[in-house]
Amino acid sequence: MSIVVSPLISLMQDQVTALNNTVGNSIDRDGGKTDIACFLGSGQIDKTVEERVFRGEYKIVFVTPEKISFRDDEFSSSTTSSSVFMQRLQSLKTMNKIGLIAIDEAHCISQWGHDFRVSYKRLAVLRDQLPGIPIMALTATAVKHVREDISKTLKLNNPYIATNSVDRPNLRIQCHRKVDFS
């Protein structure tokens, strides 16, 4: 399974729906349809989803940084203090069920980033408690010192960094005068 950390609940819900409607909904051995992706976080209404995650029923699990970084002891500054959720992720790791952790909007990790969030800074717990699982940090807006801060925070060893030009010839802006304002 792949775990995708993202800050935007509505976007994650849209991505889960799109994945399940296109790639997902394969027929299981009992003749029913199964989803391949799910969302875990405060916006999740179905309380059985988390149990299904830990039974390995999904290929892609979208979570908020708060879900990952929450500690049962919120007053501890240690990244080794873990939540029940993190302990359950460790069990999945032990069973070789987690293949990748992807962190979207990774610029939120850096205090220098334009959308800094404390819960993102705490994602260092992933490297500490789930060693050996590849971590991919994704952002479209990180300058060099923010990328360095992301690498340092997530304890990425010799990361491959792919950058591209900000010139996007495939995008354009057009302005049209609106004559009728009604």
Question: PLM ranges: what are they?
Answer:
Residues 17, 43-100, 108-114:
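Conserved helix/coil segment N-terminal to the catalytic DExD/H
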